[in-house]
Every structure is written in C-alpha cells, then in structure tokens.
Amino acid sequence: MQVVKKDGSKEEFDKQKIINSCLSAGLAPDVAEKIGNELENLAYDGIETKELRILILNKIRKEDSSCAQKWIDYEQNKT
C-alpha cells in the first residue's frame, strides 16, 4: 500500500512510523500499537500523508487527549 507524501512522491505504508510517532508523543506502547493497527486497517493505497495525520491525531485525542499537543509538536519539529 502506497502513501502519497506532501511533495507527491510515494512510499510504502509503514505502521511502525505511526507507532513511533505515537510513542514520541508519550502514548503507552499498547495504545501506540493499537493506533498503528487501526490506521493500517483504515489506510488505502494512495492515501495522502495529510489524511493520515488527521486520522492519527483523532485517534490520539480519543485515547489520551493530553498527548495530542505533544504529537502535534513532534510532527512539526521532526526533520
């Protein structure tokens, strides 16, 4: 399954990237894994990273709202 990046390039969907970003925001490992699994099931070939980010943020807010801003900060500051 391919993900379309902001610049139009494509890369293979990587559930571990989602899990790692959730962990970086302070979510518990089991919650991060759960979100990764849910996104793997929701994603489709050609999904854009922008849509994935919205889905991830919504899942984080439902699981642990205190981590939502940390995740946003992490996403904005990663290189």
Residue ranges of model-derived segments:
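Long, C-terminal-biased catalytic regions of enzyme "large/alpha" subunits
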Residues: M1-T79
